[in-house]
Amino acid sequence: MCTSLSELKCPVFSTKRKLLLEFALRTSVDMAAQEGVNYLSGLGLSRLICLPMALRAAIELNVFEIISQAGPDAQLSPSDIVAKIPTKNPSAAISLDRILRMLGASSILSVSTTKSGRVYGLNEESRCLVASEDKVSVVPMLLFTSDKAVVESFYNIKDVVLEEGVIPFDRTHGMDFFQYAGKEERVNKSFNQAMGAGSTIAFDEVFKVYKGFDNLKELVDVGGGIGTSLSNIVAKHPHIRGINFELPHVIGDAPDYPGVEHVPGDMFEGVPNAQNILLKWVLHDWDDDRSIKILKNCWKALPENGTVIVIEFVLPQVLGNNAESFNALTPDLLMMALNPGGKERTTIEFDGLAKAAGFAETKFFPISQGLHVMEFHKINC
């Protein structure tokens, strides 16, 4: 599970922290400095929730697609946009303008003022919210992380500090995330779409750097979701036989892909025998003990010269004010809220997991902005 992947190609995510803080503080910091009043700048922080909610509303109203369909340099008024939205509300344009002007002030949309009023267009940030020719955008990740079931979990995140063993999602919903997704079709669909879109964006970058798939004949994707990652790999390397191993309720939503076989199962009980195994955004879902159990099952399923290929964001040893740190820190908090012991890790911590599971050697391949491919080898190469 991951939601930061889109930062590899989309500046709206690589700058989202900057945008939020700038929006909150821009109009008040100078005044606070002049008057010596610190509380005034804090008012902006108290309203940070407004920006992501405005962004979600614009997505649900199809605003970005409407502007895109009007042309690459289109500048539309709220009335122009509302004309494409199924509503009979006479004040819709006024209400929409109030949402869009916040996005404009936050540099998510371009905004200009004409004699008739404000007009809005796409910029470098918001183009990432429009589906590409391959129908890929960062929208599925945004919709998942702002889903009510996910957001409600964060109300209990303080309990992780106050009490040992608390999982905010479980406390909020009475079951773990994957059980909940198995029962709630909306959440299951949203999660699968988010992981699928993120996988496609990720592998565009992975293929530029990592060449480890070139000579593989078989690859089992353990916890592979609806098979998007494996389909991307097999499409690029059609000589690979792909097996997507996932829980039955996830496989039930999986489309058919050329060269990919869907196999239901539970990675905690066992893994299909395989020449090579892929774990993409799986280990960060779990604590060390569960991660080691997954890796031990992979170790058992591999031949003597087999390899587990792991794809994760990696925490830098020294945190900084940069995309590499931010890309790992944001999903780390998401893992804290959703999963039992889930967390992002450093290369040293990943090496420790591999060694604890019996792997003899680890190799690390930095991709971009904190994303890494890792190889866990059963024997020394």
Swiss-Prot record:
The active site is at H284 (proton acceptor). It comes from the Eukaryota. GO terms for molecular function: (S)-scoulerine 9-O-methyltransferase activity; O-methyltransferase activity; protein dimerization activity. The keyword S-adenosyl-L-methionine applies. S-adenosyl-L-methionine binds at G223, E246, D266, M267, K280. Its EC number is 2.1.1.117. One of its GO terms (biological process) is methylation. Keywords: Methyltransferase, S-adenosyl-L-methionine, Transferase. PROSITE patterns: SAM_OMT_II. It is an enzyme of class 2 (transferase). SUPFAM superfamilies: S-adenosyl-L-methionine-dependent methyltransferases (SSF53335), Winged helix' DNA-binding domain (SSF46785). InterPro entries: COMT-like, O_MeTrfase_dom, Plant_O-MeTrfase_dimerisation, SAM-dependent_MTases_sf, WH-like_DNA-bd_sf, WH_DNA-bd_sf. The keyword Transferase applies. Gene3D superfamilies: Vaccinia Virus protein VP39, Winged helix-like DNA-binding domain superfamily/Winged helix DNA-binding domain. It catalyses: (S)-scoulerine + S-adenosyl-L-methionine = (S)-tetrahydrocolumbamine + S-adenosyl-L-homocysteine + H(+). Produces a precursor of protoberberine alkaloids. Belongs to the class I-like SAM-binding methyltransferase superfamily. Cation-independent O-methyltransferase family. COMT subfamily. This is (S)-scoulerine 9-O-methyltransferase. It comes from Coptis japonica (Japanese goldthread). The lineage of its organism: Eukaryota, Viridiplantae, Streptophyta, Embryophyta, Tracheophyta. The gene is SMT.
